[in-house]
UniProtKB/Swiss-Prot annotation:
Pathway: Carbohydrate degradation; glycolysis; pyruvate from D-glyceraldehyde 3-phosphate: step 3/5. GO terms for cellular component: cytosol. SUPFAM superfamilies: 2,3-Bisphosphoglycerate-independent phosphoglycerate mutase, substrate-binding domain, Alkaline phosphatase-like. It comes from the Bacteria. GO terms for molecular function: manganese ion binding; phosphoglycerate mutase activity. This is 2,3-bisphosphoglycerate-independent phosphoglycerate mutase. The lineage of its organism: Bacteria, Pseudomonadati, Bacteroidota, Bacteroidia, Bacteroidales. Belongs to the BPG-independent phosphoglycerate mutase family. Catalyzes the interconversion of 2-phosphoglycerate and 3-phosphoglycerate. The keyword Isomerase applies. GO terms for biological process: glucose catabolic process; glycolytic process. It comes from Phocaeicola vulgatus (strain ATCC 8482 / DSM 1447 / JCM 5826 / CCUG 4940 / NBRC 14291 / NCTC 11154). Its EC number is 5.4.2.12. It catalyses: (2R)-2-phosphoglycerate = (2R)-3-phosphoglycerate.
Length: 504
């Protein structure tokens, strides 16, 4: 017997340890407690490999909504590349084969450039090591590494240690460090072309401090009070590792935003006023797609195109849907929920409620939850939508302030909004699933009592509000939510959705 379905996402509302750090447990939530007492509920895993992130990494709203809407685990770039390196399938990657074969057959130099650290935000040290190993396997003599130093996602003087580790790896593998420069120059994202030119001149002309010992050169920089992020260009004078016509370049950053500008000046656009020109015949490989407009560059790991998300599948089957949230989480219930698609599907309506204009949300912990709730209840009463998804942002956005009494106020506001929403839904023939995308307000204090502003690794709730007294629900992951929504709607699950229906 099919019904209409409402999916309520309480952002940052995890299942805590019921200790003093667990604001959700310690705040009176009479309506939430009544739901747990009267309806079937279970737990969803919302972090690490259960949402396509590396093991032990906390979930986030983007990844969470992507998994929820996709109905399958969507593997993030880092995990995909890690897997390819671990099982050696990277050796069969057609673009890897083309890059190394081209260099070998044409006697060209191969260059690896990117953020050389273990920060894990833009790049991975392990990926660079693997590229060196592949170069060794292909027997490519001239393998040059251009190191962009970190100091933002890592300690400001950790770079020297990374250069030592890389040097040691190259000795048993392949590759020579040809140049070093801080990410301040090589990874700008604000069109400060005068910074990018410093990196460009180093890579293309070998301009910079000339050094024979790259580790010593790093230490000299520290001695001068210049740390990793701001390291001035250093060129290895013992090799000619500049990028030349027809060479192969692999930019091993997997995050795109800070890799774009250097890629532009090397491959896309001459900037004569800055003295930068693209290099003819360059075989340029990006780890992931940096920009859809880029021409003539190769992509090692393309984005997964998530087909048949819940939104797409409902639209294809003539169902009506509403996506509603306040500004802070609007992109999450639209773009991310729909698998990275901006434009609405047929018969998909959207309501954006402006978030309050305050410096930090502890100043208005209820945010715009009541306004979202009022608009949502109106929409429920029209009975025109087969499916509705709403996000209440407070648990996460106020949780990020780390201010305990503000988080308490946020939790109380959510309890009231959940009550009005669920009661309206029940009165209008909707079944309701209530979940979170990740934890936050459930872990507001560190062990030493200081505020914890980060997401938690805790599981999140799955509450099924139904008139069916025999219903049971199982534990699962975020990818299991969409199949459970289809169960309520009485629709078959498409093959693309590999999550499972948790309603029994």
């Amino acid at each position: 017997m099919s019904k209409k379905a409402l999916l309520m996402i309480l952002d940052g509302w995890g299942i805590g340890d019921q200790g003093k750090d667990d604001v959700i447990f310690n705040t009176p939530t009479p309506y939430w407690d009544s739901l747990l007492a009267n309806y079937p509920h279970s737990e969803l895993q919302a972090s690490g490999e259960n949402v396509g992130l590396p093991d032990g990494q906390m979930g986030n709203s983007e990844v969470g909504h992507l998994n929820i809407g996709a109905g399958r685990i969507v593997y993030q770039d880092l995990v995909k590349i890690n897997r390819a390196c671990a099982d050696n399938s990277i050796m069969k990657n057609p673009e890897i084969v083309s890059a190394f074969s081209y260099a070998k057959e044409n006697g060209k130099n191969i260059h690896f450039m990117g953020l050389t650290s273990n920060g894990g935000v833009h790049s991975s040290f392990d990926h660079l090591f693997k590229l060196c190993d592949i170069s060794k396997e292909y027997g490519i003599e001239n393998t040059f590494i251009h190191c962009f130093m970190d100091g933002r996602d890592t300690d400001p003087k950790s770079g020297k240690g990374f250069i030592e580790q890389l040097t040691a790896h190259c000795e048993k593998s392949a590759g020579k460090i040809a140049s070093i420069v801080g990410r301040f120059y090589a990874m700008d994202r604000d069109k400060r072309w005068e910074r990018v030119k410093e990196a460009y001149d180093l890579l293309v002309e070998g301009k910079g401090k000339q050094a024979t010992d790259m580790v010593q050169a790093m230490q000299e920089s520290y001695d001068e009070g210049v740390t990793d992020e701001f390291i001035k260009p250093i060129n290895n004078s013992t090799v000619d590792g500049t990028i030349k016509e027809g060479d192969v370049v692999i930019f091993f950053n997997y995050r795109n935003d800070r890799a774009k500008e250097l890629t532009v000046v090397l491959t896309q656009q001459d900037m004569p006023e800055q003295g930068m020109h693209t290099i003819p015949g360059l075989q340029f490989y990006c780890m992931t797609p940096y920009d859809a407009s880029f021409k003539g560059v190769h992509i090692l790991f393309d984005k997964e195109n998530v087909q048949n998300t819940l939104g797409e599948y409902l639209a294809a089957n003539g169902k009506t849907q509403l996506h509603i949230a306040e500004t802070e989480k609007y992109a999450h219930v639209t773009f991310f929920f729909n698998g990275g698609r901006e434009t609405p599907y047929d018969a998909e309506e959207r309501i954006l409620v402006p978030s309050p204009k305050v410096a930090t949300y502890d100043l208005k912990p209820e945010m715009s939850a009541y306004e979202v709730k009022d608009k949502l209840v109106e929409a429920i009463k029209t009975q025109k939508f087969d499916f509705i998804v709403v996000n209440y942002a407070n648990g996460d956005m106020v949780g990020h302030t780390g201010i305990y009494d503000a988080i308490e106020k946020a939790v109380k506001a959510i309890d009231e909004c959940v009550k009005d929403t669920v009661e309206a839904a029940k009165a209008n023939d909707y079944e309701v699933i209530i979940i979170a995308d990740h934890g936050n307000a459930d872990h507001a204090l560190n062990e030493d009592g200081t505020p914890n502003t980060a997401h938690s690794l805790n599981p999140v709730p799955f509450v099924y509000v139904t008139e069916n007294k025999n219903a049971k629900v199982e534990n699962g992951v975020l990818a299991d939510v969409a199949p459970s929504i289809l169960h309520i709607l009485g629709m078959p699950q498409p093959a693309d959705m590999t999550g499972r229906d948790l309603i029994k």
